[in-house]
Amino acid sequence: RPGDVHTHVFAQQFPLMDENGRMQPYMLAERERGVHFDVGHGSGSFWFRQAVGCFNQGFWPDTISTDLHHQNVTGPAIDLLYVASKFLAMGMPLQDVLYRVTRAPALSIHRPELGTLDVGACADIAVLRNREGKFGYMDCGGARLTGEGKLECVATLREGEVVFDPEARSMPDWQNAPAPYWTAPGTTRSWTLWK
């Protein structure tokens, strides 16, 4: 039905290609009918031989997600940004990757207030860096694809408040820290920094 979601779309058990490497007509027909295709990358549900073949024929997933659990956080899924980075490596433009991990999932579950930076929306924000270099990405079959970018989270805000800041971007330099920094309970600062 329109609006249904087919997840694990690039799993090995789905016959996405015919014997000549062309996309199966049923995939295109289902998309035309309004079925959404989701990645749902877990331990066995993402194979480059499926995904790249579809990409080369213009068939991209509607949403990029994980099926993350304790058995795949060390590979092959690892985390959502690792999965998103695989799509960069396969040639999906950054803007399309970001849309498919933010806005598209929100719309598919009928939550238009999520996945947006509109004025008045909840300020849930991930600040990302696209690090350049050579990076290897694994699929569920133990094969590798090399890419030239890797998405990394440098800060996260939840409802406008910083909740993750591994590079201390929201903190003052220690020399300029406010008064409570400089005292242990029951003491006062008795020295000055010389520059």
Say what each PLM segment does.
Residues 12, 43, 103, 131, ...:
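Short, solvent-exposed coil/turn elements at secondary-structure transition points
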Residues 43-44, 104-107, 133-137, 142-143, ...:
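A short linear-motif detector with a strong N-terminal bias
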Residues 20-44, 83, 90, 140-162:
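P-loop/Walker A phosphate-binding loop and immediately adjacent motor/lid segment at beta-alpha junctions
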